[in-house]
Amino acid sequence: QDGKPIVCLSSTTDDGRSRIKPLLEAGDGVGIARSDVHYVITEYGIAYLFGKSIRERALALIEVAHPRWREELLKAAQKLGYVRADQYLASQAAYSVHDERIVTLKNGTKVMMRPARASDAGALQGLFHRLSEDDIYTRFFRRVRSLSYPDLQTLCNVNHETEVAFLAVTGPRENEEIVGSACYFLSPTTNLAEVAFMVAPEFQGAGLGTALQTRLQEYAMSRNVRGFVFEILPRNTSMLRLAARAQGTITTSRDDDVVHVTALFANSGSASRSPLPESQDPQAGEVAA
């Protein structure tokens, strides 16, 4: 009673062929209707399928297929119209369960922070549409009504090396809700990463932005990233306070209508802080991010 159908299988057969297929072949046995399956589990991760769109199901299954077969499966899915023609796979690595973290926010809510996946695009759009117009403007520096699919993929379909993205989610895995997003994009010339955040309105002021930044820093420092770079509108005081809480040496400058904040991590040099202008004092109020 109340059980959930779960399919567990190795990603390949004994002779190396993919067990994840774009279509069932003649003679393939079916033990359960495909529409009823909740989870498919391989050694490369867990795909949750129940209630998802065809695009989301196809991407989730490709993500848990053997890396050797993913490009072929993606091309087949594109040919069948299951996914967009411009869909790509930024990473061939398995989803890293070891990079998941559970944190308790100031309001007592428990939130999981996990690596983003290509199949998260639809849920990220949902987070975007919950943001206020001002949140959107201070995040993207322009008025945006909706994120294009390529924009969404930039925020979740990453290689986890020079492009990194973490999501904050609540609820059970089969019905999780994205309440926050943090990502960075590394410059190979400076070894500094530009960072960006989105936090759902109901979680602003609860410390989620700080928790996401801490997780992003932990990941970056483990990969010898030199530091973070923030590009912030002066009126975005919440983000200025969040940047001031970054680890290491903090320096700021202003160019036209943008405040540039650089945080050099302690393992890349001095760990002292240069003072921010009074209006950017991190103790001036609570962090809304």
PLM region spans:
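Conserved phosphate- and dinucleotide-binding cores of soluble alpha/beta proteins
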Residues: Q1-Y88
